[in-house]
A protein has these predicted regions:
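Conserved acidic catalytic loop of the alpha/beta-hydrolase fold
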Residues: 249-268
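Primarily recognizes the serine-hydrolase "nucleophile elbow" in alpha/beta-hydrolase
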Residues: 267-320
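Aromatic-rich carbohydrate-binding modules that target alpha-glucans
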Residues: 34-78, 88-110
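A short, amphipathic beta-strand motif
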Residues: 26-32
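A domain-start/cap signature at the N-terminus of enzymes
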Residues: 102-174
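C-terminal catalytic histidine-bearing segment of alpha/beta-hydrolase fold enzymes
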Residues: 328, 334-336, 343-396
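Bacterial N-terminal signal peptides
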Residues: 8-19
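Active-site machinery of serine-nucleophile hydrolases
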Residues: 182-252
Length: 396
């Protein structure tokens, strides 16, 4: 009864008075195939934040008394989305009965509750082992696995050294620190197979062409607590809210280690921090709150919408900082709702306006760009990373 009151009756009652509800419920009912492990947890993974942005998980389903897997997600009315069913990762994604690929399943949130019923024919791991992925790392890379911390979970750190590093023992280099490090250098560890930033190849090409000065790239892997690490505030929908601890890890533990181990420059203008999505959000916060450490910020496709655009309020309260900021957003990063609202794009525009209002100057210490048709994934970010790196590393 509670579910019907929440999703089934109240939208109709509101509609009688001309009120459009802010959210609509989409209920999933999944029938799993024979042979599904009895302790399996099923997930709906899709292309919107509420479904995990294709992270292999997203919305966790629970088992109903009838033995089906059920769950409900709230979305703005009119939101179109695509999804698949998994058991928590892409190695266990749903397949056809003969092991073939299935197309992304479509869905749309309407004003009332919609129920989407799915029959999973088979799971990927019933037919094949996940293919071995070949490493695509290039250049002089040093590995620091399971780097320990008092503040956050241990994680791998990869350090890419520029051409000529070993041959110039007296030279020191600026540092570019990048979040979601699994996606930065290596298609074998990237979130989606083969979709990596190609930061190592791009940096080497720019350095050899004289378009940027030689620099050290540091790829810092995420952890299962990614939302917590990359967000300062708790979002009532998703949790999070511990990036102050992640900042302490970077500033008090990782940077001192890098400075002891490698020939780094340590002025704020010689330290750049770059990330995408929630990584773009935490990059901006690191610049705002620790401008004495990080003087250059790459905020790529930032999740400005997090916690009711809290970062926009923070920019206004904090005011201008001596930090150079690259910020961009793809126009295809959020599916329009029925009324044309696009949360990612409009939130990025609000952040741009707040930065300008606080004193950042477009073309001087702020670059803002909307990339027509660009989606929210590593391939799109790789396609523009050369311009990001060149603008941030340019001497000014």
């Amino acid at each position: 009864m509670g579910s019907r009151l929440r999703y089934g009756w109240w939208p109709m009652l509101l509609g009688m008075f001309g009120v459009v509800p802010a959210v609509a419920g989409v209920r999933f009912e999944v029938r799993a195939p024979a042979g599904t492990p009895p302790d399996a947890v099923l997930w709906i993974s899709g292309d919107v934040a509420e479904l995990g942005h294709w992270n292999g998980a997203g919305l966790r389903l629970t088992t109903s008394p009838e033995g089906r897997y059920v769950g409900t997600v709230e979305l703005p009315p009119g939101t179109a989305f695509a999804f698949k069913v998994t058991r928590g990762d892409w190695g266990t994604v749903e397949k056809t009965a003969t092991g073939g690929e299935i197309a992304n399943r479509p869905g749309r949130a309407s004003a009332g509750e919609d129920t989407i019923r799915i029959e999973v024919a088979a799971w990927r791991d019933a037919f094949e082992k996940a293919p071995t992925r070949t490493s695509t790392i290039t250049g002089n890379v040093r590995r620091h696995p399971a780097f320990p911390s008092r503040f956050v979970d241990a994680r791998d750190v990869l350090v890419w050294l520029p051409p000529g590093y070993d041959a110039a023992p007296r030279r020191r280099y600026p540092v570019v620190l990048m979040h979601d490090g699994q996606n930065v250098f290596d298609g074998a560890t990237s979130f989606l197979p083969g979709m990596e930033w190609q930061a190592d190849e791009t940096a080497e090409r720019l350095i050899r062409a004289g378009r940027i000065p030689p620099c050290i790239l540091v790829a810092v892997a995420n952890s299962p607590a990614r939302r917590e690490d990359y967000t300062l505030e708790v979002d009532p929908r998703y949790g999070g809210g511990r990036s102050d601890r992640y900042a302490r890890f970077l500033i008090e533990e990782l940077l001192p280690f890098l400075d002891r181990t490698y020939r780094t420059r340590t002025r704020p203008e010689d330290r750049t921090v770059i990330g995408s999505s929630l990584g773009g959000l935490v990059s901006l916060d690191l610049g705002l709150l620790h401008s004495d450490v990080f003087g250059r910020v790459g905020s790529i496709s930032p999740a400005v919408w997090w916690a009711d655009r809290a970062v926009v309020t923070r920019v206004t309260a904090t005011g201008h900082r001596p930090v150079r900021v690259w910020m961009d957003i793809g126009t295809a990063e959020s599916t329009p709702t029925a009324d044309g609202h696009r949360e990612w794009l409009e939130s990025a525009q609000a952040l741009r306006d707040a930065l300008v209002g606080a004193g950042w100057r477009v073309g001087r210490d702020l670059h803002y760009e909307e990339i027509e048709g660009a989606p929210h994934n590593e391939s799109a970010w790789a396609a523009r990373f050369d311009r990001v790196l060149e603008w941030l590393q340019a001497e000014r």
